[in-house]
């Protein structure tokens, strides 16, 4: 468990919500191909379609991409500012991090991160190592933030999602939040794919993928 800091208001710790006397809870074994959940597409291509994700395959892919794309492990903390209605909200806010044993931060309203004070409190008080934001939110943060840099010594990886990342916004994102210039994990995914299918990796120092590109499949 991470050391708590009372400076971050409206923060609820999972350990405070569960019965600490019960270290293990009952669970049921299921087959790997058993349906886990149904998530509907946005409907941008017509009538929304319900996508069924299986238990074993989905969990394995969630864990794999968290490790490979972001470098997540059980000693790190990830903040994925995605609504639960998006597949990324399922995969990179919940199932992926928890399957690894990492710490994940759930934001009830991701738009609240446009408050510079709130964002800094989250990043510094909760020692966020991986910050994964929608490009729309990155632009909004830039539009309302001061010109001061919010550099955190804890941040190791930055990620973007949702729409193309321009070079201008990408450079601002890196310059503002990281101590050193790091590769942005600019991601492409679909509801149907369960998670990321194209992106640079967190430690990609070879291909030099340009901003706005998600690389090759």
How should each PLM-predicted stretch be described?
Residues 35, 41-44, 66, 78, ...:
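Conserved S/T- and glycine-rich ATP-binding loop of Class I adenylate-forming
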Residues 1-16, 134:
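Structural core segment of the AMP-binding/adenylate-forming
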Residues 27-30, 188, 210-217:
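Short Gly/Pro-enriched turn/cap motifs at secondary-structure boundaries
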Residues 59-77, 87-129, 143-145:
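Conserved AMP-binding/adenylation subdomain of ANL enzymes
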Residues 99-102, 129-132, 142-211:
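Gly/Ser/Thr-rich phosphate-binding loop
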Residues 38, 51-54, 81, 87, ...:
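Generic beta-strand/beta-sheet core signal
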Residues 56, 136-139, 163-164:
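Alpha-helix/helix-capping structural signal
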Residues 10-11, 17-40, 47, 71-77:
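Conserved pre-ATP/AMP-binding loop-to-beta segment of ANL
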């Amino acid at each position: 468990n991470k050391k708590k800091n009372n400076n971050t208001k409206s923060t609820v710790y999972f350990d405070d919500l569960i019965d600490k006397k019960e270290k293990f809870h009952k669970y049921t074994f299921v087959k790997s191909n058993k349906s886990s959940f149904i998530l509907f597409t946005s409907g941008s291509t017509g009538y929304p379609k319900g996508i069924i994700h299986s238990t074993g395959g989905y969990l394995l892919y969630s864990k794999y991409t968290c490790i490979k794309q972001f470098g997540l492990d059980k000693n790190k903390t990830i903040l994925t500012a995605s609504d639960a209605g998006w597949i990324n909200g399922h995969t990179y806010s919940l199932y992926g991090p928890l399957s690894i044993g990492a710490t994940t931060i759930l934001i009830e309203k991701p738009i609240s991160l446009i408050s510079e004070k709130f964002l800094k409190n989250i990043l510094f008080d909760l020692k966020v190592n991986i910050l994964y934001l929608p490009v729309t939110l990155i632009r909004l943060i830039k539009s309302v933030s001061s010109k001061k840099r919010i550099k955190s010594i804890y941040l190791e990886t930055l990620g973007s999602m949702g729409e193309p990342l321009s070079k201008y916004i990408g450079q601002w994102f890196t310059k503002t939040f990281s101590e050193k210039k790091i590769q942005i994990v600019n991601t492409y995914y679909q509801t149907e794919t369960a998670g990321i299918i194209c992106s640079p990796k967190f430690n990609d120092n070879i291909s030099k993928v340009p901003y706005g590109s998600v690389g090759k499949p």
